[in-house]
Amino acid sequence: ACCARLCCSVPTSPATTICSSDKFCRCGVCLPSTCPHTVWFLQPTCCCDNRPPPCHIPQPSVPTCFLLNSSQPTPGLESINLTTYTQPSCEPCIPSCC
């Protein structure tokens, strides 16, 4: 599969806010930093799609925003899977693919 480099921007600061949003991703996992919103489960999306799926699946788990690696309470974290998915073998993108 080809890997288009058109994913949503992912914050790299130590305290990354994970919230829901209406943004769309071409590939990877979307970690928007727009608050306050309901926190959603994250889901990897596929590349090479002219009509990309939403970054999240509608399964609200926490009613408020929270910061990772912060000293603030983060209720409901045990219900959120933050596994990162990678694609080690990606073919170069071509116009017909992406």
Curated annotation (Swiss-Prot):
InterPro entries documented for this protein: Keratin_matx (IPR007659)
Tissue-by-tissue expression: Wool.
Statement: the UniProt record of this protein carries the keyword Nucleotide-binding: no
GO CC annotation: cytosol; keratin filament
Superkingdom field: Eukaryota
Pfam families cross-referenced by the UniProt entry: Keratin_matx
Chain positions with N-acetylalanine modification: 1
Keyword Acetylation belongs to the record: yes
Example GO molecular function: structural molecule activity
Keyword terms of this UniProt record: Acetylation, Keratin
Role, per record: In the wool cortex, wool keratin intermediate filaments are embedded in an interfilamentous matrix, consisting of hair keratin-associated proteins (KRTAP), which are essential for the formation of a rigid and resistant wool shaft through their extensive disulfide bond cross-linking with abundant cysteine residues of wool keratins. The matrix proteins include the high-sulfur and high-glycine-tyrosine keratins.
Similarity annotation: Belongs to the KRTAP type 3 family.
PANTHER family documented for this protein: KERATIN ASSOCIATED PROTEIN 3-3-RELATED, KERATIN-ASSOCIATED PROTEIN 3-3
Subunit organization: Interacts with wool keratins.
Name this polypeptide is given: Keratin, high sulfur matrix protein, IIIB4
Species whose genome carries this gene: Ovis aries
